[in-house]
Amino acid sequence: MDPKSQRVKFNDGHFIPVLGFGTYAPEEVPKSEALEATKFAIEVGFRHVDSAHLYQNEEQVGQAIRSKIADGTVKREDIFYTSKLWCNSLQPELVRPALEKSLQNLQLDYVDLYIIHSPVSLKPGNKFVPKDESGKLIFDSVDLCHTWEALEKCKDAGLTKSIGVSNFNHKQLEKILNKPGLKYKPVCNQVECHPYLNQSKLLEFCKSHDIVLVAYAALGAQLLSEWVNSNNPVLLEDPVLCAIAKKHKQTPALVALRYQVQRGVVVLAKSFNKKRIKENMQVFDFELTPEDMKAIDGLNRNTRYYDFQQGIGHPEYPFSEEY
């Protein structure tokens, strides 16, 4: 990590800010909140914004970015913006149109990072979550290597600066890395990662291949969305985390974010609350000791909040593997 600019270098030479602003919110949250929160995040210093076609807020997020460029707060090149290819567009011929649709919604010329949202391909069409009469997901069958080739073409066309994946296990990453004629390696793998699911083996694997691990749900998951397993314990109430926070006069959330930064993980902080958005920027103002890091490592219990159980049974369901 380059501490001065707080950025990490990708294997393709581009840089990603280590702290990102997450924009996912449950459907009942008005989209206008994404607009206001993203503007505020940029005002207080966030330079990395993470969204996705699935979140259905790219118009608002794009508007926020453009308004902060228009008022002189930032230039386009100061902002690192990530979008994601949703599961119903993994067929190679659907990849570029999906990215172009995101760009159209954003009203931007390019994204900085475009990633495959999940390896679980779903039936193409206008439904994000296509289901049959019995309510089961309708799967599609796609060779992810072919999807990857379509992403490589998007990079060559200048629609995205970098390309990566999300929710891939190490075997799925290996499949891409070992692909004959591979032009570009994935720059990152964005996965759920927090002290209860610290992904140490996947992190080690990614580091050995010069792939950056990006953490979502870094504070656990408070959202009662259809993707969340709600029987899990609340991460931010963990006594060890709370004790370390108290010692440093920080919040448990900041300790959880700082933990990732010190492991070389790029971390997304999702909040639409102005006080917390501002607070999350303080992750660079303190340092955890080696003892703190070891204690937090010891909290791992392989608890997955986003286990995407509807995807079980798909040949590419990623979470049956250990990592």
UniProtKB/Swiss-Prot annotation:
Keyword Ligase in record: no
Keywords associated with the record: Cytoplasm, Fatty acid biosynthesis, Fatty acid metabolism, Lipid biosynthesis, Lipid metabolism, NADP, Oxidoreductase, Prostaglandin biosynthesis, Prostaglandin metabolism
Biological or metabolic pathway of the protein: Lipid metabolism; prostaglandin biosynthesis
EC number: 1.1.1.188
Subcellular location: Cytoplasm
Top-tier EC class: oxidoreductase
Active site: Y55
Binding positions (substrate): H117
GO cellular component: cytosol
One Pfam match: Aldo_ket_red
List of residues binding NADP(+): 20-24, 50, 166-167, 190, 216-221, 270-280
PANTHER family linked: ALDO/KETO REDUCTASE (PTHR11732)
Record's function text: Catalyzes the reduction of PGD(2) and PGH(2) to PGF(2 alpha) and a stereoisomer, respectively. It has a broad substrate specificity and also reduces other carbonyl compounds.
UniProt record similarity statement: Belongs to the aldo/keto reductase family.
Protein name: Prostaglandin F synthase 2
Organism annotation: Bos taurus
